[in-house]
Amino acid sequence: MTGPDSFPCRRLEFIGDSMTCGFGNLSAGPQEPFSPTTEDSTQTYAALTSRHFGADTRYLCRSGRGIISDCEGSRAQPVPRWFFETSLTHPQPWDFSSWQPDVAVINLGTNDRNGGVSQEEFTAGAVAFLRRIRGVYPNARLLWMYGLMDEDFIPAVKEAVETVRAEDPLVDLLLVPSIYPHPEEQGACNHPNLAAHARAARALITKIAKQTGWAARPSFWP
């Protein structure tokens, strides 16, 4: 008999936007509007990766948000503003010592591009965010994932990751090709559907396995 206590704990954290939420992933195609009934967070690239590794996982994601700006250009509540707090409505500092991930995956950038942020400003914001995350997660691998929807900020993301990696070898980058040339991978409002999430999960699983040496194992979380 095996159970959760039979294995050393693996911990993953996903910091993201609508893709990590599962926005529109159950939709029949990009022509469909968003509906809560077609958003399934249990079938995202993040959830698939978590189950593959049998990991204890935390998700911090909110649709439309970015590093500097949201998808409509507002800079009122970017991810770095609330990530370090208990909640949006109770902005007390979060106690990060209570739970430390082995790998933290950051999947952000698409909404900044749509919100009119320049590449230079995004790079500076991403560098600052990575350094702040390192301050609260001193031993975690930090993996920036980008490209599944929009590829325009690849130069900015690369520059940010390379800047921090020069001082921190546990920082890395995973670029995933966009769904935009592939209508068969698009759900509501041109978001990734189940096929796209599965493709992204395969790429992420391969990357994390290479980084950590983790193999697949039974998952005890839904």
Show which residues each predicted segment covers.
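N-terminal secretory targeting modules
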Residues: 1-41, 210-222
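Surface-exposed acidic, glycine-flexible loop patches that form ligand/cofactor-binding
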Residues: 3-5, 90-100, 131-137, 211-215
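Structural recognition of the beta-strand scaffold that forms the well-ordered cores
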Residues: 11-15, 20, 57-61, 102-107, ...
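Sec-exported extracytoplasmic/periplasmic mature domains
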Residues: 20, 54, 109, 131-138, ...
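Conserved SGNH/GDSL esterase-like catalytic core that processes O-acyl groups on lipids
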Residues: 25, 30-124, 148-160, 187, ...
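Extracytoplasmic/secreted envelope proteins and their assembly/folding machinery
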Residues: 46, 50, 127-130, 201, ...
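Glycoside hydrolase catalytic-domain groove-lining segments
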Residues: 117-142
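Catalytic His-Asp segment of secreted/periplasmic serine-dependent ester chemistry enzymes
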Residues: 148-222
